[in-house]
Amino acid sequence: VKERYGDDIHEGDIFLMNDAYLQGTHLNDFTAVGPLFYRGELVGFGAARAHWADVGSADTGMVMGSSNIFQEGWRLGPTRVVEKFRELPDWFDLLTRNTRLKELTLGDFRAQIAAIRTGERRLGQLLDRIGVDTYKSACANIFDQAQRLDRAAIAALRDGTYYREGWIDNDGISDDPVKVAITVTIDGERLLIDLAGSSPPVKGSINCGAVQTISLLRLAYKTMISPERAITGGSFSTMEVKIPEDCIYNAKEPAACQWYFTTFGLLADLMISCLSEAMPERATAAHYGDSMVVVFASSYGAKRGWLSVEATAGGWGGSVTADGESALINLVNGGFRNLPAEVYETKFPVRVEEFAIR
């Protein structure tokens, strides 16, 4: 946002983007960003990301067989859609005309705006109490503390280089297996991650942008390195990630990205397995592997469209002290909650015949 708009950013503005290559996920994930002002001074930015149910792809909700980004919906770079608290009607018209689920989409977007407004209001209340200078000093100290603690945690581990690889059955279009490879090097206070050896971009829609790949690796890092500590702007300073240009995890236009998360469970497991060489007491074995969600959607021409994206659950690997847990959501979709069968049948024209652990 700052790169595109520079000083042309005002109190009350809201910017919106979903470009899969900029933010790393897929076109359904829209990030709303708003500047946070206090007494006329820009003191930060608030952001809220939400998965929009339908963005005009070839299929309702999430296209199944895409082979390029243009089949997956419309793509938006950082764009101002609210200016000085005034919604720009042309943009809102464009947003609602390009979705089959207008009410749900507009409701999600306005909830994102409300979240940013709430954050700005509460930050203002904090600054009323402590002042801007104290706030900035506290942020710097918190970030510095996180960096020091991360460096100490890595320095306490045994130096070494650890390699793992695994395979996804296919990319959803061809029958060719997809390779996932990772090398983790611990060198003093630094943790280096290299994805060289992973598959090049594939025809199917399981490619992923570099930004979200790094986010996934940070998640795996955090499960092993001081998970009890909060994540701040100083976290992950010891972690360096190298992703080859020609790689499934460094998607470029026109690579399809709809199901970008398909390989993420495996990649996280492989990184944890690498780190287990240096800290076996914290590691768990791999958890179940699948595409993580089941999608049902209304047929074309339905009077009222509907969409269900239900997270799957499965078994997690055991640790040195305990067996693995059963029926947990995948690590990547940890924010999902399973929907009770009664609610599911009420909301959607779907009958649940059995809900059980196999």
Map each language-model feature to its residues.
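Glycine/proline-enriched, intrinsically flexible loops and inter-domain linkers
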Residues: 1-358
